Design a protein with these regions (language model features):
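Short amphipathic alpha-helical segments
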Residues: 16-18, 40, 72-75, 102-106, ...
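Acidic, glycine-centered active-site loop in nucleotide-sugar glycosyltransferases
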Residues: 40-43, 76, 85-87, 128-131
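Rossmann-fold NAD(P) dinucleotide-binding segment
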Residues: 50-114
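Short, well-ordered coil/turn elements that cap or connect secondary structure elements
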Residues: 21, 41-42, 85, 110, ...
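Rossmann-fold dinucleotide-binding core
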Residues: 96-173
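Hydrophobic alpha-helical segments typical of transmembrane helices
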Residues: 7, 15, 35, 49, ...
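NAD(P)+-binding Rossmann beta1-loop-alpha1 motif at the extreme N-terminus of oxidoreductases
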Residues: 1-62, 88, 93-94, 124
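Residues in the short beta-alpha loop(s) of Rossmann-like NAD(P)-binding domains
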Residues: 32, 66, 139
């Protein structure tokens, strides 16, 4: 399965590094061209346009800094789904509220793809060391297909049930 990763910030960089070092066929996209270039030097496919990443990925993981960026990336006019008609698995590792996850999930499902909300804990050190805890909500089959990649980034992977349940659990603490 071809993996795309969007967002190479404090958490995303370590997560993407672990995917790459564990053998994932990885494409990356982020706002910083320097970060894309650095990942190319490590062996990832650098995507300087979102469309390139979407068209070269079956599984798309994103780790973004805020609600507005997540919504724009997922539901925006030039977001992920505007570049494909093929079924994709979209995983949101961003820290967003349950309502945002619901909006994203409903939109992605309406476009024929699947959505997993997958909040993470462990901080930048856990992301770098591959010891994150990842709670996942959404389609069980999509979770099973994605699980080997979660295991490349974390040591505790927990399926929480249906869509939004992982985010609801995270926000309850």
């Amino acid at each position: 399965m071809k993996v795309g990763f969007i967002g190479l910030g404090n958490m995303g960089q370590g997560m993407a590094d672990n995917l790459l070092s564990n053998g994932a066929e990885l494409s990356v996209f982020t706002r910083s061209k320097d970060k894309i270039s650095a990942m190319e030097n490590k062996g990832a496919k650098g995507c300087y346009e979102l469309e390139d990443l979407v068209q070269n990925s079956d599984l798309i993981l994103n780790c973004l800094p805020d609600v507005n960026t997540s919504l724009d990336l997922i539901t925006g006019d030039k977001g992920i789904m505007s570049y494909t008609k093929e079924k994709k698995i979209i995983v949101d590792h961003s820290t967003v509220d349950v309502l945002t996850s619901k909006k994203c999930s409903k939109y992605i499902l309406s476009q024929g793809s699947t959505f997993l909300d997958a909040p993470i804990s462990g901080g930048p050190v856990g992301a770098k060391d591959g010891t994150l805890s990842i709670m996942v909500g959404g389609d069980k089959d999509s979770f099973e297909k994605s699980k080997p990649f979660f295991e490349m980034m974390g040591t505790t992977i927990k399926y929480m049930g249906g869509a939004w349940e992982a985010g609801a659990y995270e926000w309850s603490y």
